[in-house]
Design a protein with these regions (language model features):
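Short beta-strand element of the conserved SAM-dependent methyltransferase core
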Residues: 106, 266-268, 329, 632, ...
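A short, hydrophobic/aromatic-rich structural module that often spans a beta strand
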Residues: 157-160, 313, 358-365, 372-373, ...
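Extracellular/periplasmic, surface-exposed regions of secreted and cell-surface proteins
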Residues: 231, 282, 288, 416, ...
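Conserved small-residue
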Residues: 342-398, 498-499, 747-748, 757-758, ...
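Acidic surface patches and DE-rich sequence motifs
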Residues: 134, 147, 157, 519-520, ...
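A subset of solvent-exposed loop/turn segments in beta-rich extracellular surface proteins, enriched
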Residues: 370-372, 382-400, 516-529, 534, ...
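Short, small/polar-rich motifs associated with maturation and membrane association
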Residues: 1-468, 482, 839, 867-869, ...
Length: 940
């Protein structure tokens, strides 16, 4: 702690000496500005100077408001700032002083009259001292403390301390770049302490993009971002569920609530291809620049920010891997300063929001008899299944063993369950090493009521996840930064041998009178009265299984600055090793149930099978992914021109024993990016990915995937009218191409599949009836297609970012369109004369699909005194259409799926059921809806 604190002070003291040693007036003379303003307030001129330069103007509004409201004309071209200031203040009672270019650029003070100077001499001066700190109790070295309306001021030293000579009644203001200024009136006290809060300005947010980061106001692609604060607002079980409804353009569908299986399926701007396998539709997931398969293993407390890259401009650098969009996760890292320790835990209650209310046994018996009586085929010789005596026994509950009445939902399920999330992390660092270390535990329990039966082992559904992460940033030398990351996620999922779906299906289909439940720790059935021989608790007797997962990630990155060759040039590289292993243990029980019978006054439990021992079955698997990259970056600033460039080579290998032919899966690619920024006003970007694949024949393996984008910040234009309503306006557009090389798990699509040994008589020779003999041999399965090439998608995007009333209201809107051609697919039709099935035909490029829509976000927020509020809403609409596919010939045109949405439900829309014999006799057939109101019933 002592060394880190000293280094922190040393860094800030160096910054202070740097600030004090500058030549501010010379800088003001060197900085030029071009303005063309007519009849505008002086305040508007100052705002334009702020936007066109690095200056920040500070003044006390109450003293200078009338002077700053005076209107002036300013027409200058590449003129020094000091000349402009002299011009606009020449007819006012305002003077100025340029302090420095980093902290406070301009001070505006009232000109002192001789009378006021004389009064100042006569006033009683007092010596005051104080400190300026941030919210983390760190000194703000170089912070300005001044007396408003005068030229009296001071700067905070290495300890954040200052000293001034002031008069009672003066107003002190402490300010620091990036922080809200704070004011206090001088009374009799001589000691002051200022604690400044950081300015919340979303336009200055840093957005993580592919292999880099940019200021949000200069981004030209379609990118949305959330922070760890957003992810932790609700106690979700995983990140995919936490993202639901939080990001425009991201569609989330949760299909299960089972512990460990309740993650959501994520799609960025819908589905752009009709390839049915998930891999062809899933977005690419990157964590700290390294590809991962599953984001749900990550502890949300480890996440610093999460970006969604949606258009071609944002995803082109990922080539074929980013065809369906990219999710970039940036984990937390250490910061300079003393150790910061954080501990958090939360407990959430889970329950079923709705369960059916079943009939009791009495109602069921009555309804069953009535339903059978109305059965047309049985009504002539119908004998009620349930006698009146049995129905009365159900009603009174006089014999609960043989005439039971059990609500199986209440009997087998708990009212609620719990899940917990606990995290402990520590971060900090010195000038040499910064660190972030995190430990997390997540537990999630199921809803089965395990108290009704004890087989000697636990069959409750339960999930446990343990997370560990350590991120280290090491300044090896002045120019070399090395980052070492280690993360490990371990999960354990336990459940009965019967799936949750089977258990719930049993609850839904078992009537209340089927069985008496569990008696004396025996799962009981009844078959000799009216029981069905079923008991929904019988899955509890079949054993249990556990699945263990271990995900280990090791990665190292370096950045080497080469300013000695060219300022702004740096080399970068990364190497990662990812190991994923699973082990499944299954313990099978005999599944003994007992049929209950009565012999006089004695109850007899007849076992369904003989008792036995548990049997064990285990499986395990492992895969390894190795990734490496090397590249160079450049950032150059030339006046108002900023140019950045990136060239990067990457490759990866994936090892998995289940891969076809036991050959590792390889990947290679080149990445290029160039951005241009003129005065934060005109923005341009070119991205390109060059990728190779194993699936296509030589000569077709590599493909170029370029993307282009432009942006225009209108509010940075000198002629744009400045007002309090519209504070920021940017329009942007992008166009690009992305590709896909995958179709299911098939590999080497240009080659035929391996010949297989038939193992039976498949080849016959000779004449039938005499020498006709069958022989075993090899046969070809799936054929290859050497003409196969890339599936490509052309993507368009136009959007706008708008801020109103000093950024209190924000609006982002995007319209997108994707046209995908040469879709990789298997044929659905094949002429019978070919003699092979469609499943053995090779893959083809035959299919077209269009996907379009819009998304956006509206945010409202402000700070009122010590209170702040923030409201955000987003919207997404995506609509796809299959333009061409290989489809079986239909008898009617309306039966074709081509021209409809992918995955659209198909069939007639029912209009209810018949409720009386009159309706049955009158119609004679089901009733359907005329969806098109054209007096024709068609599927919809």
């Amino acid at each position: 702690y002592g060394r880190g604190h000293f280094c922190n002070k040393l860094k800030r003291s160096i910054l202070l000496l740097f600030l004090l040693g500058m030549f501010p007036y010379a800088w003001g003379q060197q900085t030029n500005v071009s303005l063309n303003l007519r009849n505008v307030p002086i305040k508007s001129v100052l705002s334009q100077i702020e936007k066109s330069t690095n200056y920040y103007v500070f003044f006390y509004t109450d003293n200078l408001n009338s002077e700053l409201s005076k209107r002036v004309n300013v027409t200058v071209n590449n003129t020094p700032v000091v000349t402009v200031l002299n011009q606009i203040f020449s007819t006012t009672n305002i003077s100025y002083e340029i302090k420095n270019k980093r902290q406070v650029s301009l001070f505006l003070v009232e000109k002192s009259s001789p009378k006021s100077k004389a009064q100042a001499v006569k006033s009683n001066k007092i010596q005051i001292t104080g400190t300026v700190f941030d919210a983390n109790n760190e000194p703000l070295i170089g912070a300005s403390v001044r007396v408003l309306g005068t030229t009296i001021g001071s700067m905070a030293d290495i300890n954040g301390a200052f000293k001034l000579e002031v008069s009672p009644g003066d107003v002190l203001e402490a300010s620091y770049i990036g922080y809200n200024p704070q004011q206090v009136k001088v009374g009799s006290q001589t000691r002051f302490q200022f604690v400044l809060e950081e300015v919340a300005n979303t336009l200055d947010d840093i957005v993580v993009v592919g292999y880099s980061s940019q200021k949000k106001e200069t981004v030209t692609g379609s990118i949305s971002m959330v922070t760890t604060k957003d992810l932790l607002q609700s106690p979700q079980a995983n990140i995919s569920n936490a993202l639901g409804g939080r990001i425009p353009g991201l569609l989330s569908v949760q299909r299960s609530g089972e512990p460990g299986q309740d993650m959501s399926t994520l799609r960025i701007r819908g589905v752009g291809t009709f390839a049915s396998d998930a891999e062809s539709q899933n977005p690419l997931i990157m964590v700290d620049g390294i590809e991962v398969n599953n984001l749900n293993d990550i502890d949300p407390n480890e996440v610093e920010s999460l970006s969604i890259l949606k258009d071609a401009s944002a995803t082109a650098v990922y080539g074929v891997r980013g065809a369906n969009g990219v999710i970039l996760i940036t984990t937390k890292r250490g910061e300079l300063g003393k150790p910061k320790i954080s501990f958090s835990t939360n407990v959430a209650i889970t329950n079923f929001p709705f369960l059916p209310e079943p009939m009791n046994s009495y109602e069921y018996a009555r309804a069953y008899n009535e339903a059978q009586a109305y059965d047309y085929y049985s009504q002539l010789s119908y004998i009620p299944r349930y006698s009146e005596e049995a129905i009365e026994a159900y009603r009174t509950g006089s014999d609960p063993l043989f005439y039971p009445d059990i609500n199986w939902y209440d009997y087998m399920l708990k009212d609620f369950s719990t899940q917990t999330q606990t995290n402990f992390n520590v971060s900090g660092g010195t000038e040499r090493v910064k660190y972030f270390v995190s430990l997390g535990v997540f537990t999630q329990n199921g809803m089965l009521d395990t108290g009704i039966y004890d087989p000697g082992y636990s069959y409750q559904i339960a999930f446990r996840r343990y997370n560990m992460r350590s991120n280290f940033d090491i300044n090896v030398t002045k120019n070399l930064l090395l980052s070492l990351d280690i993360s490990n996620q371990m999960g354990n999922l336990q459940n009965p041998n019967w799936s949750t779906g089977q258990i719930m299906e049993s609850l839904n289909s078992t009537p209340s009178n089927a069985a008496p439940g569990v008696i004396d720790n025996k799962v009981v059935t009844i078959t000799d009265v009216f029981g069905s021989g079923r008991n929904p608790a019988s899955p509890y007797t079949r054993g249990w299984k556990s699945k263990y997962e271990n995900n280990l990630n090791l990665s190292g990155r370096f950045t080497y600055k080469m300013d000695y060759l060219l300022k702004g040039l740096s080399l970068r590289g990364a190497l990662s090793y990812k190991s994923y292993s699973t082990e499944t243990k299954t313990y099978n029980d005999r599944g003994i149930t007992y049929d209950l019978r009565r012999a006089g006054d004695e109850l007899i439990f007849v076992p369904s099978t003989d008792p036995g021992k548990l049997t064990y079955q285990g499986t395990n698997s492992r895969n390894i992914r190795i990734y490496s990259e090397i590249g160079a970056e450049y950032t150059g600033k030339f006046g108002e021109h900023t140019v950045t460039g990136l060239v990067l080579y990457n490759q990866g290998k994936y090892y998995n024993p289940t891969l076809k032919y036991n050959i590792p899966n390889g990947y290679q690619g080149l990445v290029g990016r160039v951005t241009y920024n003129y005065g934060n006003r005109y923005l341009a970007e070119v991205n390109v990915g060059y990728n190779g694949t194993e699936n296509f024949a030589p000569g077709k393996r590599f493909g170029w995937f370029p993307a282009y984008s432009l942006g225009w910040v209108l509010t940075e234009e000198p002629y744009f009218p400045r007002n309090e309503v519209l504070s920021f306006l940017k329009i942007r557009g992008s166009y690009g191409t992305v590709g896909n090389d995958k179709i299911g798990g098939d590999r080497f699509l240009y080659l035929p599949s391996v010949y297989t040994y038939t193992g039976s008589n498949s080849y016959y020779f000779g004449e039938v009836g005499s020498s006709y003999v069958g022989y075993v041999g090899s046969n070809e399965s799936k054929a290859g297609n050497p003409d196969l090439t890339w599936e490509k998608a052309i993507k368009w995007n136009v959007g706008a970012d708008v801020k109103f009333w000093g950024d209190r209201i924000g609006l982002t809107f995007d319209y997108f369109m994707e046209h995908r051609d040469n879709i990789l697919c298997n044929r659905n039709t094949v002429p019978t004369i070919i003699g092979i099935s469609a499943s053995n035909l090779p893959a083809y490029n035959m299919g077209r699909m269009r996907n379009s829509g819009w998304d956006g976000e509206i945010s409202v927020g402000d700070r009122i005194g010590d209170w702040s509020y923030f409201v955000k809403a987003n919207f997404t609409y995506a609509h796809n259409k299959i333009l061409e596919q290989d489809e079986v010939i239909r008898n009617e045109d309306y039966l074709y799926r081509t021209g409809l949405r992918y995955g659209q439900f198909f069939g007639y829309v029912a209009d209810g059921i018949f409720n009386s014999w009159e309706e049955v006799n009158a119609a004679g057939r089901p009733e359907y809806v005329m969806a098109n109101n054209n007096n024709k019933i068609q599927p919809g």
